Amino acid sequence: MKKVFYLFTIISTTLMAQTTNYYESCNGLSGEALRAELHNIIKDHQSFSYTTTKTILREADEDYNNPDNIILVYTGNSIDKFDFASNFEPDFWNREHVWPKSHGDFDAGDPFEVPAYTDAHNLKPVDHSMNTLRGEKDFENGGDVVFNGSSLTDCFSTNSTFEPRNEVKGDIARMIFYMDLRYEGGSGEPNLVVVEGLTTYPNPQIGSLSTLLEWH
C-alpha cells in the first residue's frame, strides 16, 4: 500500500510540475506579447485523423451517469456513444464544428489533412437536426426557442444567430477563443478572428465577441 501511495504521489507531483511549467514562458508578459507566446505554446498540438476524433469525443463527452452513452452538446440528451450518424440518421450523433468550417474555408481541398478541420478542441457531438439548425450562425443571445423535432430545447435561434443552452455557454466560448488563438494564418492555416457583431462566411471570422466574453 505504501508503494502504491508513493507512486501516486510521484505521478501527481510530476503532473502538477508539468502543468506549472507549461505556461512558464508567459511569466511577465502581457498584451500582444502574451498572446504570441500562448500561440507558440499551443500551435504544435497533436493532430489526429478525422476518423479518430469520433473515439476522442466518445471519451471526452461521455455521460458520467451512463458510460455507454455520450452527451449531445446543444440538447444535453444522452444517447448510445456508438450510434454515430454515417448517413444523417436523425436519432444518431455526428460531429459539430463549433467554429464553423465555412468561416475560414478550412474545409477546402482535402479537409482531412487540414489541422483546423480535424482539431478535436473544436468538435462536439450533436444530432443531425441541431447540427443543421445551428449551421454557420454566429453566437449571440436571443431569438426564438429551438425545437428539436417535437422536443423543446434550451437553445434560441434567429436567421443569423444561435444561443446554446446555459450549461455549455462557457465551453462554447472557450472553444471559440482557442481557435482564434491557435490559428493565426501560419503555414497555410486560416487566420481565425473573433469579432463584434455578425459575420459572413467564408470570411475567417465569427461573432459576437462581447457575448462570448460574457459566456466565458
Protein language model regions, located:
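Sec-dependent N-terminal signal peptides
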Residues: 4-13
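Short secondary-structure junctions and interdomain/linker hinges
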Residues: 11, 45-49, 80, 134, ...
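Alpha-helical transmembrane segments and their juxtamembrane interfaces
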Residues: 12-16, 107
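N-terminal module-boundary/linker segments of secreted carbohydrate-active enzymes
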Residues: 17-80
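Domain-level detector of nuclease and nuclease-like folds
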Residues: 87-216
